[in-house]
Amino acid sequence: VGKKVAFLARHGIGHVYMPSEVNYRANIFALKKLGVNRIVSISACGSLREDFHPGDIVIPNQVVDLTHRRPRTFFGEGIVVHISVAEPFCESLSNLLIDAARSTKQTCTPAAPM
């Protein structure tokens, strides 16, 4: 109640950008400028795991990024920064999402790599 929320249409208004066309760094920069400090992202995708079913909610705890054609950092050009990705997700926010999903009796799988 009384919380401000920012919404960003990842694929643009009208869903017009392919994933490879999305300017992720601009999106993150814009959210940061708005004062956003936590992000909840929704995605629909398939899985090779037979124990995941359509409609299941999965709360990731790690990322495997196999993309190669887009910039991976805000740094460079003489600026070297080392940022740990050992725990890329906020544990307290993940726990809130898990509790919310389970309260609806929806199948929820916590701690799954994405």
What spans do the regions from the language model cover?
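Active-site rim beta-loop-alpha module in soluble metabolic enzymes
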Residues: 88-114
